[in-house]
Amino acid sequence: MLVKIELYHDGEFWCARGIGEDIFTQGATLDEAVENIKEAVAVHYDEAEQPTSILILSEIELGSRTTTAS
């Protein structure tokens, strides 16, 4: 089974929520959030239905890009 997680930065924390699942966690750093995702997924499912993979989807802002006309 594949679990899909949306990961985003809310300005202070990295937040993660399950897509189609009642899973939510967060972390102060990206690495902490990923570890918390693994733990949250593990406790969400019974032992018999543990997922085999976690797909983490994230949008990361690159900052403002300016273009100049030539």
Task: Specify the residue positions occupied by each region the protein language model found.
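Residues that scaffold the ATP/ADP-binding catalytic core of kinase and kinase-like folds
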Residues: 17, 26, 44
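A short, structured beta-strand/loop element
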Residues: 8-23
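A short, exposed loop/beta-hairpin motif centered on an aromatic-Gly-Thr core
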Residues: 21-31
